[in-house]
Amino acid sequence: MKFSGIQVSILALLRVCLAEADSGEGNQEALPHANFDITYECLERDVGGLSSFMEFENGDNATLQYKFTNKEDLNVSVVGLGGRIYDVQKNEDAANISASAIGPLDVDVNGTTEFQHVIKLVLKEGDYVLSPDVYVQKENETMRVVTNPSLIRILPPPMSFFNPKFMLVQMVLGALIAAFSYFTFFKPSASYGRDAKKLKPDGSVSRMDSSWLPENHQKKK
């Protein structure tokens, strides 16, 4: 049974999340069941979640617009953003999104705040899982909350006009067009000229033997 790229991505991501849940990172633990409602959209692309890929080129920016709602019973503060990018084909991390401090943005109970995170995608061509994190401070504890992942695809770089491969293709196409034009227009013209020479009259007239005709039809001299 063959898995599609999306199915492989989901399985790979679940594997990573389970591994993180088993291994805590000090006081910055991944709490997948934290009572926060965190959604985001990509301003450059439509967020497809795990159902479709967001397509980028290497070096593009992905600007994530977050909406954070606090459903805990205490006030909290959003203090940082981070995450990771997972390589679907190699089943390993492709890049870490360096944790960056924001705010702190204080969020009351049942309160909502919005913020942005710009991620520069320096990746090779291929399929990846983007897994953003939000760092939240609750009382004296800082927790790393894993948000919903999204699939991203890095497209092959556009071919430059001066790329040797592109120039070779242009030369081959030019040679084919020239050969086609030659055999289509010039060859028939030359052949027609030779045939015309063969058919050109030389000025002589051959007489028809009319001796077999009846006497009344024979041409009188």
UniProtKB/Swiss-Prot annotation:
Keyword Coiled coil among record annotations: no
Residues in the Lumenal compartment per record: 20-165
Primary localisation category: endoplasmic reticulum
GO cellular component: endoplasmic reticulum membrane
Membrane-crossing residue ranges in chain numbering: 166-186
Known function: Is probably involved in a pathway contributing to genomic integrity.
Protein family per UniProt: Belongs to the IRC22 family.
Protein name (Swiss-Prot/TrEMBL): Increased recombination centers protein 22
Organism: Lachancea thermotolerans (strain ATCC 56472 / CBS 6340 / NRRL Y-8284)
Lineage: Eukaryota, Fungi, Dikarya, Ascomycota, Saccharomycotina
Chain's gene name: IRC22
